[in-house]
Swiss-Prot record:
HAMAP family: Lsm_RuxX. This is Putative snRNP Sm-like protein. Belongs to the snRNP Sm proteins family. Disulfide bonds: none annotated.
């Protein structure tokens, strides 16, 4: 059976993810929540633009309308 997108996101709970935004920039942080609209809650999130951290947040909700992609981040 094919893997569903929300299954991938669910397996990423409590792990670091990269959230790419439609208008450029990205958030990187620990995924602590999400819903079917791809609204995501990140803890310890950094907003990154052009490879540089612009601002750090303790906890932030990113509205699903702004999300282009969500990717698990493997930290070794």
């Amino acid at each position: 059976m094919a893997e569903r997108p929300l299954d991938v996101i669910h397996r990423s709970l409590d792990k670091d993810v990269l959230v790419l935004l439609k208008r450029g920039g990205e958030f990187r942080g620990k995924l602590i929540g999400y819903d079917i609209h791809l609204n995501v809650v990140l803890a310890g999130a950094d907003y990154i633009q052009d490879g540089e951290v612009v601002k750090s947040y303790g906890k932030i909700v990113v509205r699903g309308d702004n999300v282009l992609a969500i990717s698990p981040v493997d930290i070794e």
